[in-house]
Structures are given as C-alpha cells and as structure tokens.
C-alpha cells in the first residue's frame, strides 16, 4: 500500500518541475535575468556602502576640523590666562611696593615731627633747675607735641557733647548731682582721631 504522504510530496515535486519547465519554455532567458537582477542588487549594495563610507569620511573630516578649531581656541585661552596671571602678579608686586613706600613715608613724616619733642625732653632732663623751670620746660614740650599732632591732622576727641560709644570707652558709671544722664563726668585718658578715624578712644566715666 502506497503512503499518502509520500505520494503527495512526489505529486508536488512533479507539479513544481512542470511549472519550472513551462516558465523556462515561455522565458528561455529566465536564469540570466535572475542572475542580472542579483548582480544589480549586489551593485546597489556596493553603491550604498560607498555612499555611506563617503558620508562617514566627510563627517570625520568635519569632526577633525572642529576638534582642531577647539584645540586652537583652548591654546589661545591658556595663553591669555597665563598673560593675565603674569600681569596680576606684577600688579600685586607693584601694589605691595607702593604700600610699603607709603607706609615708610608716613612713618618718616611722623618721626620728623616727633623727634624735636624728644630733643626738648632730653634737654630738659639735662638742665639743672628748679621745679618751676622743669614745669615750664615740660609745658613747652607738651605744646610742641600738640603742634606736631596738629600738623599730622590728629585732634583730641571732645567730650562736651556727652558720651558717644563710637568715640569714648566707659570705664564706670557714676552718680553726679545736677548732671544729666549719659554725660562724661571725668576723662581718665584722652582720645585722639584723624578725620573720621579713631586712633584711640577716650577712657571716661559716665553719669547715670
């Protein structure tokens, strides 16, 4: 008995073979045409690959160009930073020297005005005389010292307008009959200022 499955397979193969033969009979060049189509497809694939490669090369060239441009810009920024750093360092050195010169000149100016006061004090100590003579010498030296402070634009801090924490330092608070509160009752140590700059606060007692 013949197997139906094998019979069907054999029948399909026979039919397919007959169809192929009929196709070849109608189109004797079918194999060549199929081969040409295959060659065209392969050629198209090569063209596609070439175009993609060309695009990649162009993209790579553009990337290299941008990279080179960025590298040049980076080098320019580095050079600029180095120049600015060098200029700042030179400026700092010049500023330090200028500050030192100003400080030295200021100290020299103060000493020039104060040394005569020291000279007079030394002369007063060297002279033999009465207490009155010594007192007169000290008074003269004090006046000379005050003149030197005036030339330096240094003035004594006033206490006439009452206690001011910006100018005075309260040592204690006292009761004083007939005095208004927050007034300077006594000055323990005078204060001095130059312009708006307080050199030394006045040490005072303040009324309640």
Swiss-Prot record:
Domain of life: Bacteria
Region of interest: Disordered: 1-38
Acidic residues composition bias: residue spans: 29-38
Membrane-spanning segments: none
Keyword Chaperone applies: yes
Complex and partners: Homodimer.
Family per record: Belongs to the GrpE family.
Protein name: Protein GrpE
Organism: Clostridium perfringens (strain ATCC 13124 / DSM 756 / JCM 1290 / NCIMB 6125 / NCTC 8237 / Type A)
Organism classification: Bacteria, Bacillati, Bacillota, Clostridia, Eubacteriales
Name of the gene: grpE
């Amino acid at each position: 008995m013949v197997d139906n499955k094998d019979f069907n397979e054999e029948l399909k193969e026979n039919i397919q073979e007959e169809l192929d033969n009929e196709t070849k009979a109608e189109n004797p060049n079918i194999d060549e045409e199929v081969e040409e189509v295959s060659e065209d497809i392969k050629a198209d694939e090569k063209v596609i690959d070439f175009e993609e490669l060309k695009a990649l090369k162009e993209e790579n060239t553009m990337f290299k160009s941008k990279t080179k441009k960025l590298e040049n810009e980076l080098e320019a920024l580095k050079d600029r930073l180095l120049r600015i750093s060098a200029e700042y360092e030179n400026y700092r050195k010049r500023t330090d020297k200028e500050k030192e010169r100003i400080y030295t000149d200021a100290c020299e100016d103060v000493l020039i005005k104060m040394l005569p006061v020291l000279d007079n004090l030394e002369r007063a100590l060297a002279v033999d005389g009465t207490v009155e003579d010594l007192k007169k010498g000290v008074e003269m030296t004090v006046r000379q010292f005050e003149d030197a402070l005036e030339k330096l634009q240094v003035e004594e801090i006033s206490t006439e307008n009452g206690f001011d924490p910006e100018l005075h330092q309260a040592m204690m608070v006292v009761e004083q009959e007939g005095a208004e509160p927050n007034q300077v009752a006594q000055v323990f140590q005078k204060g001095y200022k130059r312009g708006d700059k307080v050199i030394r606060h006045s040490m005072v007692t303040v009324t309640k």
